[in-house]
């Protein structure tokens, strides 16, 4: 029995006009985006189509990606496609919570708009940096971060694949970690174009505000298992608030999450929402995995044909 997991895109996957074709062609997609606009108090479709500056600002990026992803999820559900498990990268975890039945969509929209604003305030653009480290053993990376942390905060932030780990933190400390990694033989280090050092201790203030906002939301039972970023384990309802609070300031354990899904029998991964970042990671983790992504009319039709 083939088991299928839906994976939901995270921040950085956004692009101008994402989801436009599907919005024009399918009522459920239009209804979902319009529903988000009502919650937000601004025209989300117009922002996604016409305002690239805002679309790349964390407080707008997060609801834009969430709404686009959930709209596509609802369309697939309408077509009879349902996952056996779900997960999402960072922000994508909120789309996964909606898909799993644990979080109401309108609550999710309001929540990620707050999350985006808190993250922006806690780590204003330019306040830190993130660097992807390729083809370097995890223990070497962790050791370099530990040594460099005499200069400030620097830790692994995203364990994307065994050969791609992102470190993040304060500029001086990250730069020192990069020097140490180069001395240790790391050849490929790529500075990332992100608005802040997410998933590090620099987001403590955002984490505290988010904790407060999360207590005001009512969560439901999971209709489908969700593998969480922070521990790479199936999330339990009574721990949702704790794990989402920690998720902003702790590393995302993506490749361990994929391994857990594979242990549970998942062989097919469908990436939902803008971009193909997660499909790329899964391919690096296991080149035998079956992959598809759905973000526009062409990819939807290709997926439905298979």
Enumerate the language-model features and the residues they cover.
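Alpha/beta catalytic cores of group-transfer enzymes, especially the acyltransferase/condensing modules
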Residues: 12-13, 100-242, 246-248
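A short, acidic, amphipathic alpha-helical segment used as a generic capping/interface helix at domain edges
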Residues: 249-266
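Glycine-rich phosphate/pyrophosphate-binding beta-alpha loops
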Residues: 61-63, 197-198, 251
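FabD-like malonyl-/acyl-CoA
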Residues: 2-140, 188, 268-297
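Non-catalytic positions within long, well-ordered alpha-helices that form the structural scaffold/packing
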Residues: 77, 182, 262-265
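Short glycine-rich catalytic loops that host catalytic nucleophiles or stabilize transition states
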Residues: 191-194, 262, 295
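Short, charged, surface-exposed secondary-structure boundary motifs
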Residues: 300-305
